[in-house]
């Protein structure tokens, strides 16, 4: 019996590795790309007489896009307004966070469906609980068993990537919080490598410098280094974060006292977040979310780290009023910068259900924003949305190209 082959013919095909043909064709067999290029050349060189042909001449075929920063368990909360007070927003967001396993599972499943239908092929999720991780793994196992994963592309694939177990722990609570984090990682079999075979990696995410002390960060980095886990954290996201690290006061000091009471271990660090964490960058692979507030010395520091990537979330950054992100300066300096959505809370609500229903979980909207606002080169945006994101996730970047042998995780736009 011959292996089923699919011939995709499109108005154009393109990736970030130099493939560009219009009209173009991609030949897929057993979930892998076996050939691509101009339609006439592909049909001449490859026997496609028995192939199932899909004509997409009004579409552009791209590799599946990479969302390198999302919060799937918040999906069912939906977009929320921001009135200018981060304190009020945080309290509102916390009050709406799903609590039960069923609520978390439903949110993750919906987030995965929305991500997939927006053209996302790979995704890094900040999992607020082990339930968010198991919900994602189980979704993959069910899709594998039924083969019923829906997609807008001709070759549907599950949303692979990384689920980062989120953790908190500052002041004198760091040791106890880290032990709880270790238990969570053990619960999802991240430390003994016995988790079910799925395209999901497990990572660890100390939340941010204002919610995790340096000992917590160090313990997470050591654990990740020993077990080959990636690390993600929110870094240099806001001016309030910079103020907290520098002088141990301001909004985040107030919130910590509100939730945990006085703690004499909170002392001024007199350091920028990048400088504060730099000694740990040599351990494990780091994904730094946001980096909205960095100067030349910090970009230089990041450029020296081969295992550090930055994920920029343009729409979410504007939502909170953060301006003038230096992603282009970072790219010019050699920093690997990719794109993310952040949570659905920070995304604009859909204007038109048919056209925009999946925008909140999509990377195309982030690319469109940077093109319209900054006139960023489309080739740069495509790299940020594909191969750069794959490198940041620690996944083979080839699978975000149209190269023969790459996974046929494709979208048509």
Predicted regions and their residues:
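N-terminal metal-binding scaffold of metallo-dependent hydrolase/deaminase domains
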Residues: 1-47, 395
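Divalent metal-coordination and catalytic microenvironments
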Residues: 11, 26, 31, 58, ...
């Amino acid at each position: 019996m011959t292996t089923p082959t699919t011939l995709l013919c499109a108005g154009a095909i393109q990736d970030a590795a130099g493939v560009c043909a219009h009209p173009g064709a991609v030949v897929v067999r057993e979930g892998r790309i076996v050939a691509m290029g101009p339609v006439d050349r592909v049909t001449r060189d490859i026997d496609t007489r028995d192939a199932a042909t899909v004509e997409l001449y009004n579409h552009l075929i791209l590799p599946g896009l990479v969302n390198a920063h999302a919060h799937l368990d918040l999906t069912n909360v939906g977009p929320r307004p921001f009135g200018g007070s981060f304190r009020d927003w945080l309290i509102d967001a916390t009050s709406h966070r799903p609590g039960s396993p069923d609520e978390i599972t439903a949110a993750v499943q919906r987030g995965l469906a929305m991500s997939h239908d927006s053209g996302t092929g790979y995704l890094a999720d900040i999992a607020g609980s082990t339930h968010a991780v198991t919900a994602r793994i189980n979704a993959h196992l069910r899709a594998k068993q039924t083969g019923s994963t829906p997609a807008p592309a001709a070759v549907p694939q599950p949303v692979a990537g990384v689920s980062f177990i989120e953790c908190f722990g500052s002041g004198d609570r760091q040791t106890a919080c880290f032990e709880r984090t270790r238990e969570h990682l053990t619960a999802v079999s991240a430390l003994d490598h016995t988790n079910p075979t799925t395209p999901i990696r497990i990572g660890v995410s100390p939340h941010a410098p204002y919610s995790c002390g340096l000992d917590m960060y160090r313990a997470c980095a050591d654990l990740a280094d020993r077990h080959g886990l990636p690390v993600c954290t929110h870094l240099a996201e806001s001016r309030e974060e910079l103020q907290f690290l520098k002088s141990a006061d301001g909004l985040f000091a107030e919130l910590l006292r509100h939730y945990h009471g006085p703690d004499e271990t909170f002392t001024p660090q007199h350091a920028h977040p990048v400088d504060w964490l730099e000694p740990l960058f040599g351990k494990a692979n780091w994904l730094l979310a946001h980096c909205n507030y960095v100067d030349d010395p910090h970009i230089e520091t990041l450029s020296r780290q081969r295992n550090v990537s930055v994920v920029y979330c343009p729409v979410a950054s504007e939502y909170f009023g953060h301006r003038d992100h230096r992603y282009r300066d970072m790219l010019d300096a050699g920093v690997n910068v990719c794109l993310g959505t952040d949570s659905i809370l920070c995304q604009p609500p859909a204007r038109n259900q048919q056209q925009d229903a999946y925008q909140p979980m999509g990377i195309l909207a982030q690319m469109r924003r940077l093109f319209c606002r900054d006139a960023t080169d489309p080739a740069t945006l495509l790299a940020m949305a594909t191969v750069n994101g794959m490198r940041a996730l620690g996944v083979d970047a080839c699978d975000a190209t149209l190269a023969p042998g790459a996974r046929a995780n494709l979208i048509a736009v």
